[in-house]
Amino acid sequence: MGITSTTDGDGITTVTVDYPPVNAIPSRGWFELADAVLDAGRNPDTHVVILRAEGRGFNAGVDIKEMQATDGYGALVDANRGCAAAFAAVYDCAVPVVVAVNGFCVGGGIGLVGNADVIVASDDAVFGLPEVDRGALGAATHLARLVPQHMMRTLYYTAQNVTAQQLQHFGSVYEVVPREKLDDTARDIAAKIAAKDTRVIRCAKEAINGIDPVDVKTSYRLEQGYTFELNLAGVSDEHRDEFVETGKPRSHSNNRKG
């Protein structure tokens, strides 16, 4: 359980996330994930990274139960800093990162996938940001890298999911395969990258990031500022408490009137 890394003789490092039952990652886990990805990129024997997960789904975001069990804002700050570190690590990793998405990818998972270089997904995979149903904001920056602008806004405001097939149509998911073929597919793509001259590939990663029209790190931190505002106003706790108690979004009937 936790974050593990393995490197094979072909220059492929596989980073695996395993936090049963749904891969809702605790604060410490986000920092460990960031370290694992960055360490892989620093290793001269690593030519490409595969980021994958065990279990029912790729990622369920932050561990909300951990956050609600902690007094004050310490857990929130840790979770936000951890997410920012992990998202940035995928983006800044010195070699390309291939993500293999199984089942579901929501919340913080979108930040990881949106900052990756190559995305492959199982044919049952869904992607989404339930943030507004949790009284929070964040990762619109990364969702906007997966879908067109107005689709991003619609998905964000409604907290609806989008399928792997839809993302493939938009050009963000490279390949959609049956779940049992997901790991092999990710490895096949990674092997093609690993076979190239790693000196050129490392320069290519840095160059492509350099021409990116959006500063994904600054943009995401701006979003997090509004999450803090919602927390200071008490709105976020209302939503998180109801989610922890019922497993469902806060009812619209609880909206303040007037």
Swiss-Prot record:
The keyword rRNA-binding does not apply. SUPFAM superfamilies: ClpP/crotonase. It comes from the Bacteria. Gene3D superfamilies: 2-enoyl-CoA Hydratase, Chain A, domain 1. Its EC number is 4.1.99.-. Transmembrane segments: none annotated. NCBIfam families: PRK07938.1 (NF005925). This is (7aS)-7a-methyl-1,5-dioxo-2,3,5,6,7,7a-hexahydro-1H-indene-carboxyl-CoA hydrolase. It comes from Rhodococcus jostii (strain RHA1). The gene is echA20.
